[in-house]
Amino acid sequence: MNDKIIEFINNNRLLSLAMQDNDGVYIANAFYAFDILNKALIIASSPNSKHVRLATKAPNIAINIAKDNKVPLLKGLQIKAIFEKANEKQKKIYFAKFAFARLMNAEFYALRIYFAKFTNNILGQKIYFENKNIII
């Protein structure tokens, strides 16, 4: 994964994730921590939330992380990922970034990235990442 993508992920903390719904698509927001070794975004949520129920049923999801609303300064990351339960190491990564999460009654999930497109209008280019080791 390109260093510019890693830096962008590490410098942000809120993502939007989209998943399939009976009526089309559904979207939710979540704070995240980054598991760089496994190229996964870690989130906390209730297992009863609509987005977790939908993503558990159809784990191929889309993610957006964006910054700034001025076109010349626009930076954003469009991601395709697999939704799965987080492991113990990933929970620790999340707690390191969001200590308050220890007080939450939540489950933790890993959004394992298999494709990413980073747009940075300042650079005037797009940077891609693809993990062909993940079977969809």
Feature-to-residue mapping (PLM):
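A generic structural signal for nonpolar/aromatic side chains embedded in well-ordered alpha-helices
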Residues: 9, 54-55, 94
